[in-house]
């Protein structure tokens, strides 16, 4: 049976690969040749696990959401990534990659960020490990995620506002790649999602796979079986979804539901529903679905959530959708906000806008009472309070 995980050439089916400018060939190749040896080594695992436990506060709870279960007629569990240090799943990946960068002798860490969660997580771990940190962030996002910008500065990072294009995540990523091209030898570029050239999508998925590793153990304890009927997660680039499904990706008993950002509606042109609207293309070094116009130019995506407005999608998820392994639902802005309020009023948990898209998918699915459903709350909603109240 063919696996839905990456093959030895860095592809998921026909998606993925590494399409990078000549100047970065060496960096990317060095990473491809190093990452598995390092992250599978005993001393890396030991240090990574210890930091996840003592610093991040893992394992994160698998919370039986009683009132949400009653509303949707199933057994609903929430995987609480919002309870991690820094408030989201992002830190699982930043700790792993910065440990790798340190072992590769890199001195300077650069990152891109949309909602600011990956930026904060990167700045946090750089402070912990005494590394220089530069974060690229679109000017639009700097304005709408002001509090995260202040946190990064307090942590000692340099935040560079990017003023090209739509001034959001795509543009921040372009700028970070430019920086990497200028400083290939001493700089490590830490990508925050399962996007970019191979090995990034696989590396980020492996570092985030701690999520599904814990779900297996926790379900065994709570349900007497280690798999759910449904796994539900939001996708922008796809890292929290990749972590949620990693250990179940080839298990046909488990249905995978991915919620992407519908924006103002997929027919409005104001959307980030890449899987439903995208055509095959290349973005940031990987072949995947990309929202583009007739001439193949990348379109500006839109979502109320700064963490989901990316015009591409991780190659793992593109392949899952293409092969019909995952069900993909577009959740609009107002559906996400409604779902966030519902979780807050039913369970007393304020989710991030990104996670609210996963919650917004619930009303689009018909569950059976015995269905065990695990939904990942990828982050907490503190950063989005103004949007919710607006």
Curated annotation (Swiss-Prot):
Keyword entries, A-Z: Amino-acid biosynthesis, Aromatic amino acid biosynthesis, Lyase, Pyridoxal phosphate, Tryptophan biosynthesis
GO MF: tryptophan synthase activity
Cited SUPFAM superfamilies: Tryptophan synthase beta subunit-like PLP-dependent enzymes
GO cellular component: cytoplasm
Keyword Lyase: yes
EC number: 4.2.1.20
Keyword Signal found: no
Cofactor or coenzyme needed: pyridoxal 5'-phosphate
Residues with N6-(pyridoxal phosphate)lysine modification: 90
Annotated pathway: Amino-acid biosynthesis; L-tryptophan biosynthesis; L-tryptophan from chorismate: step 5/5
Swiss-Prot/TrEMBL catalytic activity: (1S,2R)-1-C-(indol-3-yl)glycerol 3-phosphate + L-serine = D-glyceraldehyde 3-phosphate + L-tryptophan + H2O
Functional summary from the UniProt entry: The beta subunit is responsible for the synthesis of L-tryptophan from indole and L-serine.
Listed NCBIfam families: trpB
Description of how the protein assembles with itself and partners: Tetramer of two alpha and two beta chains.
Family as reported in the entry's similarity comment: Belongs to the TrpB family.
Entry protein name: Tryptophan synthase beta chain
Organism: Bacteroides fragilis (strain ATCC 25285 / DSM 2151 / CCUG 4856 / JCM 11019 / LMG 10263 / NCTC 9343 / Onslow / VPI 2553 / EN-2)
């Amino acid at each position: 049976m063919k696996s839905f995980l990456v093959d030895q050439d860095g592809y998921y089916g026909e998606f993925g690969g590494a399409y990078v400018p000549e100047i970065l060939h060496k960096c990317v190749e060095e990473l491809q040749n190093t990452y598995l040896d390092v992250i599978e080594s005993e001393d890396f695992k030991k240090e990574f696990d210890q930091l996840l436990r003592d610093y991040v506060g893992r394992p994160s709870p698998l919370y039986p959401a009683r009132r949400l279960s009653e509303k949707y007629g199933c057994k609903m569990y929430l995987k609480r990534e919002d309870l991690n240090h820094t408030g989201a799943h992002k830190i699982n990946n930043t700790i792993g990659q910065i440990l790798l960068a340190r072992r590769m002798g890199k001195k300077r860490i650069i990152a891109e960020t949309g909602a600011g969660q990956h930026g904060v997580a990167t700045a946090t771990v750089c402070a912990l490990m005494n590394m220089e940190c530069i974060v690229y962030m679109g000017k639009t996002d700097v304005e709408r995620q002001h509090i995260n910008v202040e946190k990064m500065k307090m942590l000692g990072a340099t935040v560079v506002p990017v003023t090209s294009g739509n001034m959001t995540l795509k543009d921040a990523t372009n700028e970070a790649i430019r920086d990497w091209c200028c400083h290939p030898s001493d700089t490590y570029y830490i990508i925050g999602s399962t996007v970019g050239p191979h090995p990034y999508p696989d590396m980020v998925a492996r570092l985030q796979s701690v999520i599904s590793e814990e779900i297996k153990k926790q379900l065994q304890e709570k349900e007497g079986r280690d798999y759910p009927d449904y796994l539900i997660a939001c996708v922008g680039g796809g890292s929290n979804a990749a972590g949620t499904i990693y250990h179940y990706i080839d298990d046909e008993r488990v249905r995978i539901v991915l919620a992407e950002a519908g924006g103002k509606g997929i027919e409005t042109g104001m959307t980030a529903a890449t899987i439903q609207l995208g055509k095959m293309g290349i973005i940031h070094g990987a072949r995947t679905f990309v929202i583009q116009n007739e001439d193949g130019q990348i379109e500006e995506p839109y979502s109320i959530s700064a963490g989901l407005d990316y015009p591409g999608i991780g190659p793992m998820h593109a392949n899952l959708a293409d092969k019909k392994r995952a069900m993909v639902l577009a959740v609009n802005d107002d559906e996400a906000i409604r779902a966030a309020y519902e979780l807050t009023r039913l369970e007393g948990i304020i989710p991030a806008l990104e996670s609210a898209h996963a919650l917004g998918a619930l009303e689009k699915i018909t569950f059976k009472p015995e269905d065990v459903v695990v939904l990942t709350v990828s982050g907490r909603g503190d950063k989005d309070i103004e949007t919710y109240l607006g």
